[in-house]
């Protein structure tokens, strides 16, 4: 009985090791570029069925190479693909991973704005969480060029596209000097 149990455990461990070994191929930049190329049709439209596989490859590369100088870039692209697929939970997860793992990368503030706008505001219609993402960008990256976009996004939260256009038009009209018109 003991020998049968040992043999069973050994067999299960061997199968597990073989199964894992097949999925842990070390990905290279070339692998990612090939995956990226497979994402598009000839007319540059997205192959929707390929998108999840490509995003997963990007994540796998980051997991295997967390210190690589391009890891934050690939993680951002994985997040972008998930946003495009309207996979809100995965998009938020990847944004959180990116801002925690690579807070000093150029992609961290972009991820906050992207998820605030496209996930919380557009997909989930959660203006409170969208506001929180914009505010996090403003607070944690005060010198980033995207801060102004985040401030405008907060100003426009909850407005329809028509209301936003009306505000922009009014703002532009207010900037015009009346004396300039009279001349």
List each model region and its residues:
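Short solvent-exposed coil/turn linkers within tandem alpha-helical repeat scaffolds
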Residues: 61-71, 99-108, 124, 138-152, ...
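Helix-turn-helix repeat elements of alpha-solenoid scaffolds
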Residues: 45-57, 84-94, 124-127
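TPR repeat positional signature
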Residues: 31, 58, 75, 112-113, ...
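Structural register within alpha-helical repeat arrays
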Residues: 41, 78, 115-116, 154
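Bacterial signal peptide processing site
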Residues: 21-24
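Terminal, low-structured helical/coil segments at or just beyond the last alpha-helical repeat
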Residues: 136-140, 145-183
């Amino acid at each position: 009985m003991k020998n049968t149990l040992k043999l069973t455990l050994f067999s299960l461990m061997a199968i597990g090791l073989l199964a894992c070994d097949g999925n842990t191929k070390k990905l290279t930049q070339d692998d990612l570029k090939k995956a990226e190329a497979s994402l598009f049709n000839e007319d540059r439209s997205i192959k929707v069925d390929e998108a999840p596989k490509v995003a997963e490859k990007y994540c796998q590369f980051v997991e295997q190479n967390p210190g690589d100088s391009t890891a934050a870039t690939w993680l951002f692209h994985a997040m972008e693909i998930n946003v495009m697929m309207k996979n809100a939970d995965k998009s938020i997860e990847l944004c959180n991973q990116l801002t925690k793992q690579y807070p000093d990368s150029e992609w961290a503030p972009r991820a906050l704005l992207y998820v605030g706008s496209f996930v919380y505001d557009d997909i989930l219609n959660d203006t409170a969480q969208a506001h929180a993402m914009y505010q996090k960008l403003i607070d944690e990256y005060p010198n980033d060029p995207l801060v102004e976009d985040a401030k405008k996004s907060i100003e426009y939260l909850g407005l329809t596209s028509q209301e936003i256009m009306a505000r922009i038009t009014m703002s532009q009209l207010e900037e015009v000097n009346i004396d300039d018109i009279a001349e």
